[in-house]
Amino acid sequence: MKKITFLFYFLATFYSSAQGYSTGTISLNNAAGVAMTAKIDVNTLVTLTLTGPSNRWFALGFGASSMTAGTDVVVCHANTVALPSFDRYLTGFAAPVSDGTQHWTVTSNTVSGSVRTIIATRALNTGDANDYTFSSNPNPIS
């Protein structure tokens, strides 16, 4: 019985860990008073958890190391309860443009003191040319 129980827990752990991955919480920047963190969990959906200042806008881009045209971006606006046009993309060295279809669903947008925490979900592949395609396997995002 102990062997069967051990095998069950081993297989359950193996299968549950193989189904998704997480970046863990990553500190992104603390320049000019803009402290940000990001965490990306990938399973059947992508779950993005961002923290940043509540009184400034901040953004996170996927799949690029500079402001390259076509980079998928999420933008958090300062001092707003709603997050209009959260899903955006870059056209080059300019302000991000609102994506025609907002694929991210903001499930939580809270402010505690001076810190805004946003939790949003999205499909791994939206089929939109302006959206980054997340892999179901761990890969660098850039």
Q: Language model features by range: what are they?
A:
Residues 1-22:
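Bacterial Sec-dependent N-terminal signal peptides
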